[in-house]
Amino acid sequence: MLHWGPKYWRALHLYAIFFSDAPGWKEKYEAIQWILNFIESLPCTRCRHHAFSYLTKNPLTLNNSEDFQYWTFAFHNNVNNRLNKKIISWSEYKNIYEQSILKTIEYGKTDFIGAWSSL
């Protein structure tokens, strides 16, 4: 069985982390296009349907990186809840992604092994 989920989640969360804290209209437009392409590229048809449904009910918040990160965090927890997987708190998310992954990047490692990789 192909385990594509963890890599997709890391890409999504990293995109939100590196999103601008003061995005202009062009950055917001590019982020929306990126998310739509991201969802369209999901290898699972049912997952694509659920992701588009979530996006419709929970529009992106692109005021800054923090808002975008919170959207990705809530989306990930929504999926995990549906799959009966672990739900994490906002502080756990911040620890996992802002500390662990950014430290990994700082030290020049490219294999992003997030704590959610097995979730």
Swiss-Prot record:
Catalyzed chemical reaction(s): 2 R'C(R)SH + O2 = R'C(R)S-S(R)CR' + H2O2
Annotated InterPro entries: ALR/ERV, ERV/ALR_sulphydryl_oxid_sf, ERV/ALR_sulphydryl_oxidase
Annotated compartments: Host cytoplasm; Virion
Induction context: Expressed in the late phase of the viral replicative cycle.
EC annotation from Swiss-Prot or TrEMBL: 1.8.3.2
Superkingdom of origin organism: Viruses
Cross-referenced SUPFAM superfamilies: FAD-dependent thiol oxidase (SSF69000)
SS bonds (residue pairs): C44-C47
Keywords on record: Disulfide bond, FAD, Flavoprotein, Host cytoplasm, Late protein, Oxidoreductase, Virion, Virulence
A GO cellular component annotation in the UniProt record: host cell cytoplasm
Domain (ERV/ALR sulfhydryl oxidase) ranges: 1-97
Cofactor requirements of the protein: FAD
GO molecular function, one term: flavin adenine dinucleotide binding
Enzyme class, spelled out: oxidoreductase
UniProt subunit comment: Interacts with A151R.
Protein role: FAD-dependent sulfhydryl oxidase that catalyzes the formation of disulfide bonds in viral proteins produced in the cell cytoplasm. Involved in virion maturation.
Family of the protein in this entry: Belongs to the asfivirus B119L family.
Identification of the protein by name: FAD-linked sulfhydryl oxidase
Classification lineage: Viruses, Varidnaviria, Bamfordvirae, Nucleocytoviricota, Pokkesviricetes
